[in-house]
Swiss-Prot record:
EC identifiers of the protein: 2.7.11.22
Quaternary structure (record): Interacts with a number of cyclins.
Protein name: Negative regulator of the PHO system
Residues the record lists as binding ATP: L13, G14, E15, G16, T17, Y18, A19, T20, V21, K36
Higher taxonomy: Eukaryota, Fungi, Dikarya, Ascomycota, Saccharomycotina
Gene Ontology cellular component list: cellular bud neck; cytoplasm; nucleus; Pho85-Pho80 CDK-cyclin complex
The encoding gene: PHO85
Residue ranges constituting the Protein kinase domain according to the UniProt record: 7-289
Gene3D superfamilies: Phosphorylase Kinase, domain 1 (3.30.200.20), Transferase(Phosphotransferase) domain 1 (1.10.510.10)
Keywords, sorted A to Z: ATP-binding, Kinase, Nucleotide-binding, Serine/threonine-protein kinase, Transferase
Protein family (similarity comment): Belongs to the protein kinase superfamily. CMGC Ser/Thr protein kinase family. CDC2/CDKX subfamily.
Catalytic activity: L-seryl-[protein] + ATP = O-phospho-L-seryl-[protein] + ADP + H(+); L-threonyl-[protein] + ATP = O-phospho-L-threonyl-[protein] + ADP + H(+)
Protein's job: When phosphate concentrations are high it phosphorylates the PHO4 transcription factor thus establishing repression.
Native source species: Yarrowia lipolytica (strain CLIB 122 / E 150) (Yeast)
One BP annotation, GO: lipid homeostasis
Enzyme class, UniProt record, top EC level: transferase
Length: 294
């Protein structure tokens, strides 16, 4: 079961789109690691997603981003050796939360770390594009780190036209759902807002089952946008003039325990129009995080 003589595989942690992840141990140092094992198709060579992930991960060194220690390339396998993290945010919420809901203090500390990780990505011209509780890993010290850059991609200026297939539906920004292909850093900010609400309640904020259903969930809560609230929205490929018109709801109905300062940040993250969303840098300077400001 050895990935190589250097690491011992201990147990299987999960399977992703193109990889299996094991908990492992460095035979020499005894250090625990996560081994991401990618089977290489002899015809196709290394999947481009894997190559993208590797080249990005090796550059991104930050305390809120999972560290990639090593890449071991054998004939038919690619092994990525990551730092080992105890659990993901979803599991943390299920085991530490009250029916999944976390205390405000904990939500704040995790959000601060999440936004620091996002800022570091964005400062390095990288979009994560697939932020969700399962991609945020927590270690025993309570540190939160961004993982799984399978879909991430360095973005240049001018804005590239990206492929449409990104971000798990529940955390997907309305501009992406409406078919915009010129999205930018603001798509990660929307996902962060969805994750913040979910930490408060223990439930996904917008649990849509299809592209249209996802938009319906969003509009029902945040209000249906139109040309006056979001100029040029009607030019987006998936826009329909017959979207049901909803008025925005008060989020305190869903998150009664949220205070006004936290609500202000949440609403800044969850702006329908991407240009209106707060940036990662601005969000870290928000008064809700005052206690972390030196």
């Amino acid at each position: 079961m050895n990935t190589s003589s250097q690491f011992q595989q201990l147990e299987k942690l999960g399977e992703g789109t193109y990889a299996t992840v094991y908990k492992g141990r460095n035979r020499t140092t005894g250090q625990l690691v996560a081994l991401k094992e990618i089977n290489l198709d002899s015809e196709e060579g290394t999947p481009s997603t894997a190559i993208r992930e590797i080249s990005l991960m090796k550059e991104l060194k930050h305390e809120n981003i999972v560290t990639l220690y090593d890449v071991i390339h054998t004939e038919n396998k690619l092994n990525l050796v990551f730092e080992y993290m105890d659990k993901d945010l979803k599991k943390f919420m299920d085991t530490n939360g009250n029916k999944g809901a976390l205390e405000t203090k904990q939500v704040k500390w995790f959000m601060y770390q999440l936004l620091r990780g996002i800022l570091f990505c964005h400062d390095n011209r990288v979009l994560h594009r697939d932020l969700k509780p399962q991609n945020l890993l927590i270690n025993a010290k309570g540190q939160l780190k961004l993982a799984d850059f399978g879909l991430a991609r360095a973005f240049g200026i001018p804005v590239n036209t990206f492929s449409n297939e990104v971000v798990t539906l529940w955390y997907r920004a309305p501009d992406v759902l409406l078919g915009s292909r010129t999205y930018s850093t603001s798509i990660d900010i929307w996902s962060a807002g969805c994750i913040m609400a979910e930490m408060f309640t223990g439930r996904p904020l917008f649990p849509g089952s299809s592209n249209d259903d996802q938009l319906q969930h969003i509009f029902k809560l945040m209000g249906t946008p139109n040309e006056s609230t979001w100029p040029n929205i009607s030019s987006l490929p998936n826009y329909r003039s017959n979207f049901q018109v909803y008025a925005p709801q008060d989020l305190r109905v869903i998150i009664p325990q949220i205070d006004n300062v936290a609500l202000d940040l949440l609403l800044s993250l969850l702006q329908l129009k991407p240009e209106n969303r707060i940036t990662a840098r601005q969000s870290l300077e928000h008064p809700w995080f005052a206690e972390y400001h030196q």
